[in-house]
């Protein structure tokens, strides 16, 4: 999808601003020692473009078989991921306040939850790229036509 119009650019800026606000709100709610908001803020624009314009997803059906897949290898940046999922309607805004709380679906690293649009768990840093390659190979063998997007950290 083309992002060359001023309307698209403004929409991306608004999407990214909302993600930043949600990142900060979740960080405050969880407590400073629990949230890695710096890493989350560092991927805000990438996540905004992917979820707002690039990825082929169905907001009403997070389990759509032909949806694009997203893997966050640097799982500690999950605040941006959760905020993006909130912006597209997969995670209710109120649920963001439960980040890192007891019985929350929103932990310090993503944990698979198809209802919330989280396809893959993450914990061991550095596993995302190999997982993404495996998902892409599997899709090709099954003759599926979806993309796999992986965000890795600088230490991977």
Protein language model features and the residues they cover:
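Cofactor-binding active-site loop characterized by glycine-rich and histidine/acidic residues
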Residues: 31, 41-156
């Amino acid at each position: 999808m083309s992002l060359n119009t001023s309307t698209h650019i403004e929409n991306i800026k608004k999407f990214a601003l909302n993600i930043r606000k949600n990142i900060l709100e979740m960080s405050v709610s969880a407590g400073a020692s629990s949230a890695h908001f710096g890493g989350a803020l560092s991927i805000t624009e990438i996540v905004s473009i992917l979820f707002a314009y690039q990825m082929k997803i169905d907001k009403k059906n997070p389990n759509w078989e032909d949806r694009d897949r997203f893997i966050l290898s640097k799982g500690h940046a999950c605040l941006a991921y959760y905020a993006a999922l909130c912006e597209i309607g997969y995670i209710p805004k109120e649920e963001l306040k439960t980040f890192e709380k007891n019985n929350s679906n929103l932990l310090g690293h993503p944990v698979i939850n198809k209802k919330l649009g989280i396809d893959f768990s993450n914990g061991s840093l550095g596993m995302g790229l190999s997982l993404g390659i495996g998902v892409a190979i599997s899709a090709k063998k099954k003759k599926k036509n979806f993309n796999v997007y992986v965000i890795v950290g600088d230490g991977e």
